[in-house]
Each structure stands twice: as structure tokens, then as C-alpha cells.
From Swiss-Prot:
Leading EC class: ligase
Enzyme Commission number(s) of this protein: 6.3.2.9
Protein name as it appears in the record: UDP-N-acetylmuramoylalanine--D-glutamate ligase
Gene3D superfamilies (alphabetical): Mur ligase, C-terminal domain, Mur-like, catalytic domain
GO biological process annotation, one example: cell division
Length: 422
């Protein structure tokens, strides 16, 4: 079979290895290629312009590629990673799948739930790092998938047993064009889910037509206390606060519902679940606190790549002066709602990256102190010179990092290095 992989990345490379083992002819097409060549593994790589839809029998798209890209528009047999993997399931092997999506918190919640479901041989995958084809080849029986809006947009058949949508706030608007498209992508899977499946959804979307018309069973939630009350767990039984408390509560709710589907009693598992969850360590670059040589508090929240994540971070330090490093690739999002919230805080801004001039203009409009630093190192130096012991220095950029860094991880690591440098 002649297979075209649109985009040369982790997901499509894993698929290419699988296709090669099964004696298919595989070609990659990507904008980053300027001429035909073979990659390190010997796969054929072509510039996007060389794609011929008549010379291809199957196209699998890398989720980050826009639906308006010429490759996608020209493709005649386009499938998502999820739909292709779904086509491989049969009577011999079909895993149980739980999908988790949301603007913020999906990685943490996926990791928490995978830890809770360890005894059921759960493995995590999807956006979190492990491509689905690798989970398939390992024949893992229970998949906990962090699922992006891009993957959901391209998927037309595959659906999970349980779908958790944590939240939807403005993000990825450059890709989706507008918020309505972004929300519809997050909800699209509900149009595919049957009566035997379950969707756990934010209460504020209850009246949305897609949700109203979905056959799936539904549970709605509003905040962490209400979720924990439903599970008969006092909020002080968990060692998390703020947005992380909601992530933990929702992981427990999905776990409880999974047990119910398996005809197992929640009360028999509850105490052990709390112990396991309280032993869970939040990943790097998510509200990660550390102190400089003078004992002053700095917070690495580099994973805050959108407005909602930054707002959640600010709530943690409501009563303290905050020195906030803001900026990067804002992905077409209007930052005005963020600045409207700044009125409720004692805050000074340090603008970096490609959106620095936008941040400066909004700061002038809202009368908020702002220094245009452009570079992260300069922002750290400026804060170091004024930061007092009872104040907070926070990197929560409300933007992607790719205008200046290879990833949010590199941005966070450099932030820590600049702070700790003499």
C-alpha cells in the first residue's frame, strides 16, 4: 500500500516504523523539507509541494498540521492517528480507552489517572508523549490518552469509553481560526460516542447543542469541592491546591466511574486512591517553586501557554506583590481579559518575546507597570534588582515558547538557570 505521512514528527515516525514492518511504501511530506532526501532511519522525505494525491492510497496527518494546509486539502484518503489505530482493533485486541482533553490540566490529570489505574495495567499516551501505535504494539489493555483539539478535529470514528473535558478557554485560535471552532473540536467526539459511553463535562457547556444531542451518558461538574463532595472526600484529604485540586478531583471521579463500569465498589478503593494520589508529584514547569541565593521565591510556570493557565497561577498569590514575566507566541488570542483581571492584583509586568509590543500597549491602556525586556534573561535581571522577600517572581507567560525557545521546557530550564546564576 502507498502511504503518505503528512508531517515528520513523533506520531508519524512511529506509524512509519509500523507501516515499514508490514511492507508498505511510506513517504513523508513536510514544509521543513526543501528537497527530497532520506532521514536517519532511511524513510523517504519530500517537500510538501511534491505531494501527489493520485499516487497515495492512505494519508495520515500529524495533528499539528492545519486543516487549511494544502497537504490536507489535496488529500483524498485522510485519516487521523486515532481513526487509523481504531481500524486495527478487532475481536483479538481492543483496549479500553479513556480520553482526557481541556485547555489546561490535561497532562497532570492524565498522569494522575494513570497512576490511580496502575493495578488495571493502565498506560498513558497521545499528546503526553507515547504515540498510539506504540500502545497498540504493546497490546496494553487500558489506555489513558491526553487528547489535543487538533486530534479531535481530524477524528471521525474513534471514541473512548470515558471522555473527560476539563475546561475550554481561548487557545490555539491561530489554528482553529476562532473560539467556536476550538470548542466544537473539543466537543466533536460526543457526536461519535454511543449510549454505553460516558462524558464528564464542565457545567457551563450543558446547553451546547452538541452536548444536548449526544447519546453518551453525561456527568457535569463546576468546581473541585462539588466533585469531591460527590465522592464523599473532604477537600483537606488531598495535598493539592488551586487548579491542581480540580485535576486531582476529576482524576478521582473518572476512576470512580471506571470502577462502577467494572462493577467494583468505590468505597473498597477510595482510601488507597487517596494515598496514591497524595504521593503523586506534579511535573516540572507547572507552578514549580524554588528560591534564589537570597531566599526569595521564584515560580516556574512555563507550561502556562494560555490566559486561563496564567489566571490560575495568579490566584495562588492573590495577596502578594507579583512580578510577572509575560509573553511569547500568543497564538492569535486577545489578551484583554487577562489585563482586566490584573486590576485585582498588585502586579508588575516584564514583557518578552514576539508579543512584547502588544503587552506594552495593553499595559499602557490598563495603567499597569510594564517593562519591555524582549529576552527572558533581561526580565530575570530586572526582577532580581527589585524583588523583595515577601514578593513573588512568576514566569507564567500566557503564550507558547516557539518564538524564542524549542519548547516550554527549555524556557523553564533557562528561567531557572538565569535566576540561580551569580
Amino acid at each position: 500500500m502507498k502511504i503518505s505521512l503528512l508531517g515528520h514528527g513523533k506520531t508519524t515516525l512511529a506509524l512509519a516504523r509500523f507501516f515499514k514492518k508490514n511492507h508498505n511504501e511510506v513517504k513523508f511530506f513536510d514544509d521543513q523539507f526543501t528537497a527530497f532526501h532520506k532521514d536517519e532511519e532511511g524513510f523517504l522525505c519530500y517537500p510538501s509541494k511534491d505531494f501527489n494525491p493520485n499516487d497515495s492510497q492512505l494519508e495520515v496527518v500529524s495533528p499539528g498540521i492545519s486543516f487549511m494546509h494544502p497537504l490536507v486539502i489535496k488529500a483524498k484518503h485522510l485519516v487521523s492517528e486515532y481513526d487509523y489505530i481504531n481500524s486495527l482493533f478487532d475481536l483479538v485486541f481492543t483496549p479500553t480507552i479513556i480520553s482526557i482533553s481541556g485547555t489546561n490540566g490535561k497532562t497532570t490529570t492524565t498522569e494522575m489517572l494513570t497512576a490511580l489505574l496502575e493495578d488495571f495495567k493502565a498506560v498513558s499516551g497521545g499528546n503526553i508523549g507515547t504515540p498510539l501505535i506504540e500502545l497498540f504494539e504493546k497490546q496494553s489493555p487500558l489506555w489513558v490518552l491526553e487528547t489535543s483539539s487538533f486530534s479531535l478535529h481530524y477524528t471521525n470514528k474513534a471514541y473512548p469509553l470515558i471522555y473527560l473535558l476539563i475546561n475550554v478557554e481561548a487557545d490555539h485560535l491561530t489554528w482553529h481560526c476562532n473560539f467556536e471552532n476550538y470548542l466544537n473540536a473539543k466537543l466533536k467526539v460526543l457526536t461519535l460516542m454511543p449510549k454505553t459511553s460516558l462524558a464528564i463535562l464542565p457545567l457551563k457547556f450543558k446547553e451546547h447543542p452538541i452536548i444536548q444531542n449526544s447519546q453518551a451518558q453525561k456527568i457535569f461538574f463546576d468546581h473541585s469541592e462539588e466533585v469531591l463532595e460527590r465522592l464523599k472526600i473532604p477537600s483537606n484529604a488531598l495535598f493539592f491546591k488551586g487548579a491542581f485540586l480540580l485535576d486531582a478531583a476529576l482524576a478521582l471521579l473518572v476512576y470512580e466511574q471506571f470502577l462502577k463500569i467494572k462493577n467494583l465498589k468505590w468505597q473498597d478503593y477510595r482510601e488507597n486512591a487517596l494515598k496514591r494520589l497524595n504521593a503523586f508529584k506534579i511535573g516540572s514547569h507547572k507552578m514549580e517553586e524554588f528560591r534564589d541565593k537570597e531566599g526569595r521565591l521564584w515560580v516556574d510556570d512555563s507550561k502556562a501557554t494560555n490566559i486561563d493557565a496564567t489566571l490560575q497561577a495568579l490566584k495562588t498569590f492573590k495577596n502578594q506583590k507579583i512580578h510577572l514575566i509575560l509573553g511569547g507566541d500568543i497564538k492569535g488570542v486577545n489578551l484583554t481579559p487577562l489585563f482586566e483581571e490584573f486590576k485585582n492584583y498588585k502586579i508588575s509586568l516584564y514583557a518578552i518575546g514576539s508579543s512584547a509590543s502588544i503587552i506594552q500597549a495593553l499595559a499602557l491602556e490598563f495603567n499597569i507597570s510594564c517593562q519591555v525586556c524582549l529576552k527572558l534573561e533581561k526580565a530575570v535581571q530586572e526582577i532580581k534588582s527589585v524583588l523583595l522577600q515577601n514578593e513573588i517572581a512568576l514566569l507564567s507567560p500566557s503564550a507558547a515558547s516557539l518564538d524564542q525557545f524549542s519548547s516550554y521546557k527549555e524556557r523553564g530550564e533557562k528561567f531557572k538557570a538565569f535566576v540561580l546564576k551569580d
